[in-house]
Amino acid sequence: MSTKPQMKNTHLEHPEDSILTGDLSVLDWFVTPGHLSVKIDGAPAIVWGTNPATGKFFVGTKSVFNKIKIKINHSHEEIGVNHEGRVADILHVCFDWLPRTECIYQGDFIGFGGLSEYTPNIITYKFPEVVSQNIIIAPHTCYYAENALRDAVAMPDRAIWYDTESVKFVKPEAYILHRQDSFYDVE
């Protein structure tokens, strides 16, 4: 674990916006070999894992990180108290099917199984066959917290996720390979 200070996962800036402020360093990205993540646009964001304050498994939305009205759900009863409607329905199923882990993860909810096409937000995702699992999650962030979840530090999720009988994990990988040494060498 790095001792370098980390930022909380409140909002991710779009790199292309830096061009508007005169910072052209983002253009070097186009010629730098490496690994990048692909953002999946699901809803709501689901946070799950072991609460370091209680040692118990929990599920929730980003409200688990709230400073004041914290909504951490260690049971179906707590989900019923803290949430309603579609979000409560999703959290109940996530509580039943997401893997128990000592870590804390965040991912976008894509949908319930049984279809081959999903539009959780604006983007439609097509699977080659009907999804047989109960839920589809796109994990993207892991957190480290010693005590309270509101003090958790976000890190990109580098874990390899394998589907289970109940959960389909969506985590596309993308790689960039270029022959140029700098943006100015691009023809």
Predicted features and spans:
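Beta-strand-enriched accessory nucleic-acid recognition/scaffold domains that flank the catalytic cores
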Residues: 179-187
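Short acidic-glycine loop/turn motifs at beta-strand connectors
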Residues: 49-55, 132, 143
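Internal, well-ordered alpha/beta segment that forms a basic, Gly-enriched binding/recognition surface
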Residues: 81-179
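Short helix/loop capping segments that flank catalytic or ligand/cofactor-binding pockets
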Residues: 47-49, 68-69, 147-150
